[in-house]
């Protein structure tokens, strides 16, 4: 996989409806004040530099979904075609354990066929 550079400011949600939907579903997990605050958090996460506890992979479904999880914070996100956030939430510790760790969780997400 070629190395790609992600620049914060290039990963917003697809549209206002998607942003609102995901904020309603997950914004409280992050203490986001509003959907724009939540979107900025998602954008910063998906654009952050990789580090030893950040795990990332691409779905092999042809969508070019990039899935990543930070094992330190349990933050998880998916970006479509690299540039559009699909989702952003905090994964429960129990779910991470069930998949054998953060790397196992993100790999299972990349194996999904949706």
Give residue ranges: language-model regions:
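Basic/aromatic recognition patch in beta-strand/loop cores that engages polyanionic ligands
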Residues: 56-82
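A short, surface-exposed interaction/processing loop segment used at functional sites
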Residues: 76-114
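Compact soluble domain cores
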Residues: 1-65
């Amino acid at each position: 996989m070629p190395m790609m550079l992600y620049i914060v400011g290039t990963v917003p949600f697809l549209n206002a409806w998607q942003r609102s939907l995901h904020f309603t579903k997950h914004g409280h997990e992050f203490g986001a004040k509003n959907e724009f605050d939540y979107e900025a958090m998602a954008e910063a996460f998906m654009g952050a530099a990789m580090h030893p506890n950040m795990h990332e992979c691409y779905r092999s479904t042809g969508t070019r979904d990039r899935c990543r999880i930070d094992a330190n914070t349990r933050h998880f996100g998916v970006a479509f075609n690299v540039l559009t956030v699909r989702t952003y939430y905090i994964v429960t510790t129990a779910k991470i354990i069930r998949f054998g760790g953060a790397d196992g969780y993100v790999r299972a997400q990349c194996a999904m066929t949706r």
